[in-house]
Amino acid sequence: MSGTPIENAIETLNAQIGQPSQPTDWFEITQERVNTFADATLDQQWIHVDPERAKEGPFGAPIAHGQLTLSIMSFLPGGAGVGLPSLDGMKLGINYGWNKVRFMNPVQVGAKIRTVGKLLSVEEKAGMLEVINEMTIEIEGVDKPACVAQSVLRIVF
Protein backbone atom coordinates (compact mmCIF):
# COMPACT_ATOMS: atom_id res chain seq x y z
CA MET A 1 0.00 0.00 0.00
CA SER A 2 1.39 3.35 -0.96
CA GLY A 3 -1.50 5.74 -0.44
CA THR A 4 -2.30 8.07 2.44
CA PRO A 5 -2.97 6.56 5.87
CA ILE A 6 -6.74 6.96 5.30
CA GLU A 7 -6.59 5.34 1.84
CA ASN A 8 -4.53 2.45 3.22
CA ALA A 9 -6.94 2.01 6.14
CA ILE A 10 -9.95 1.95 3.81
CA GLU A 11 -8.27 -0.76 1.72
CA THR A 12 -7.39 -2.80 4.82
CA LEU A 13 -10.84 -2.49 6.36
CA ASN A 14 -12.78 -3.11 3.14
CA ALA A 15 -11.09 -6.53 2.98
CA GLN A 16 -12.68 -7.37 6.37
CA ILE A 17 -16.27 -6.28 5.72
CA GLY A 18 -18.72 -9.02 6.67
CA GLN A 19 -16.19 -11.15 8.55
CA PRO A 20 -17.00 -11.90 12.21
CA SER A 21 -14.37 -11.03 14.80
CA GLN A 22 -13.06 -13.27 17.52
CA PRO A 23 -15.23 -12.89 20.64
CA THR A 24 -13.89 -10.85 23.54
CA ASP A 25 -13.14 -12.46 26.88
CA TRP A 26 -16.11 -13.18 29.17
CA PHE A 27 -16.93 -10.37 31.62
CA GLU A 28 -19.02 -10.88 34.76
CA ILE A 29 -21.86 -8.48 35.56
CA THR A 30 -21.79 -7.97 39.33
CA GLN A 31 -24.41 -6.48 41.63
CA GLU A 32 -21.84 -3.87 42.66
CA ARG A 33 -21.43 -2.73 39.03
CA VAL A 34 -25.22 -2.60 38.56
CA ASN A 35 -25.61 -0.56 41.76
CA THR A 36 -22.85 1.84 40.73
CA PHE A 37 -24.53 2.32 37.34
CA ALA A 38 -27.88 2.87 39.07
CA ASP A 39 -26.32 5.55 41.27
CA ALA A 40 -24.69 7.28 38.29
CA THR A 41 -27.86 7.29 36.17
CA LEU A 42 -30.44 7.71 38.94
CA ASP A 43 -32.23 4.58 37.67
CA GLN A 44 -32.94 2.80 40.95
CA GLN A 45 -35.69 0.48 39.68
CA TRP A 46 -36.02 -2.55 41.96
CA ILE A 47 -35.42 -5.08 39.18
CA HIS A 48 -31.82 -3.79 39.16
CA VAL A 49 -30.95 -2.86 42.76
CA ASP A 50 -33.13 -4.96 45.09
CA PRO A 51 -31.92 -8.58 44.82
CA GLU A 52 -34.53 -9.97 47.24
CA ARG A 53 -37.49 -8.33 45.51
CA ALA A 54 -36.03 -9.08 42.06
CA LYS A 55 -36.07 -12.82 42.86
CA GLU A 56 -39.87 -12.55 42.91
CA GLY A 57 -39.98 -10.45 39.73
CA PRO A 58 -40.37 -11.46 36.09
CA PHE A 59 -36.70 -12.40 35.61
CA GLY A 60 -36.15 -14.36 38.84
CA ALA A 61 -33.07 -12.31 39.73
CA PRO A 62 -31.79 -8.75 39.48
CA ILE A 63 -30.86 -7.71 35.95
CA ALA A 64 -28.42 -5.21 34.50
CA HIS A 65 -29.81 -2.03 32.99
CA GLY A 66 -30.02 -2.28 29.20
CA GLN A 67 -27.99 0.92 29.00
CA LEU A 68 -25.29 -0.64 31.20
CA THR A 69 -25.06 -3.57 28.81
CA LEU A 70 -24.79 -1.17 25.87
CA SER A 71 -22.19 0.96 27.66
CA ILE A 72 -20.00 -2.01 28.53
CA MET A 73 -20.16 -3.25 24.93
CA SER A 74 -17.73 -0.52 23.88
CA PHE A 75 -15.23 -1.22 26.61
CA LEU A 76 -14.95 -4.98 26.71
CA PRO A 77 -11.49 -5.96 25.44
CA GLY A 78 -11.48 -4.71 21.86
CA GLY A 79 -14.81 -2.95 22.43
CA ALA A 80 -16.27 -0.85 19.64
CA GLY A 81 -13.26 -1.81 17.56
CA VAL A 82 -13.81 -5.55 17.95
CA GLY A 83 -11.96 -7.18 15.09
CA LEU A 84 -10.40 -3.98 13.75
CA PRO A 85 -6.70 -4.29 12.91
CA SER A 86 -4.00 -1.83 13.92
CA LEU A 87 -4.06 0.98 11.36
CA ASP A 88 -0.93 2.97 10.47
CA GLY A 89 -1.29 6.64 11.32
CA MET A 90 -4.37 6.16 13.50
CA LYS A 91 -4.36 8.66 16.38
CA LEU A 92 -7.57 7.67 18.13
CA GLY A 93 -11.07 6.27 17.80
CA ILE A 94 -14.15 8.21 18.89
CA ASN A 95 -17.51 6.65 19.78
CA TYR A 96 -19.79 8.53 17.36
CA GLY A 97 -23.03 6.74 18.21
CA TRP A 98 -25.23 3.68 17.85
CA ASN A 99 -27.70 2.51 15.21
CA LYS A 100 -30.45 -0.11 15.53
CA VAL A 101 -30.01 -0.92 19.23
CA ARG A 102 -32.11 -3.88 20.40
CA PHE A 103 -32.18 -5.34 23.93
CA MET A 104 -33.28 -8.89 23.20
CA ASN A 105 -32.58 -10.70 26.46
CA PRO A 106 -31.97 -9.38 30.00
CA VAL A 107 -28.56 -9.91 31.60
CA GLN A 108 -28.95 -11.30 35.11
CA VAL A 109 -26.52 -10.25 37.81
CA GLY A 110 -23.78 -12.87 37.97
CA ALA A 111 -23.98 -13.64 34.25
CA LYS A 112 -20.94 -13.41 32.03
CA ILE A 113 -21.15 -11.53 28.76
CA ARG A 114 -18.88 -11.02 25.77
CA THR A 115 -18.94 -9.11 22.49
CA VAL A 116 -18.62 -10.36 18.93
CA GLY A 117 -18.32 -7.83 16.12
CA LYS A 118 -18.74 -7.80 12.37
CA LEU A 119 -17.53 -4.91 10.22
CA LEU A 120 -20.39 -3.56 8.10
CA SER A 121 -18.99 -0.47 6.37
CA VAL A 122 -16.13 2.00 6.11
CA GLU A 123 -16.46 5.50 4.70
CA GLU A 124 -14.33 8.64 4.74
CA LYS A 125 -16.15 11.53 6.41
CA ALA A 126 -14.78 14.93 7.39
CA GLY A 127 -11.16 13.78 7.12
CA MET A 128 -11.81 10.75 9.34
CA LEU A 129 -13.02 7.23 8.78
CA GLU A 130 -16.50 6.27 9.88
CA VAL A 131 -16.64 2.58 10.70
CA ILE A 132 -19.94 0.81 11.36
CA ASN A 133 -19.60 -2.46 13.22
CA GLU A 134 -22.46 -4.81 14.15
CA MET A 135 -21.95 -5.71 17.80
CA THR A 136 -23.61 -8.62 19.58
CA ILE A 137 -23.50 -9.12 23.34
CA GLU A 138 -23.68 -12.83 24.11
CA ILE A 139 -24.55 -14.31 27.51
CA GLU A 140 -22.55 -17.35 28.56
CA GLY A 141 -24.68 -20.50 28.28
CA VAL A 142 -27.65 -18.70 26.66
CA ASP A 143 -28.53 -18.96 22.96
CA LYS A 144 -30.40 -15.65 22.60
CA PRO A 145 -28.11 -12.59 22.70
CA ALA A 146 -28.57 -9.81 25.23
CA CYS A 147 -28.13 -6.97 22.78
CA VAL A 148 -27.45 -6.35 19.11
CA ALA A 149 -26.45 -2.88 17.94
CA GLN A 150 -24.43 -1.11 15.29
CA SER A 151 -21.58 0.94 16.74
CA VAL A 152 -20.51 3.99 14.78
CA LEU A 153 -16.83 4.73 15.33
CA ARG A 154 -14.89 7.67 13.92
CA ILE A 155 -11.17 7.06 13.43
CA VAL A 156 -8.88 10.08 13.49
CA PHE A 157 -5.60 10.06 11.54
Language-model region placement:
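HotDog/MaoC-like acyl-thioester-processing domains
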Residues: 1-16, 103-157
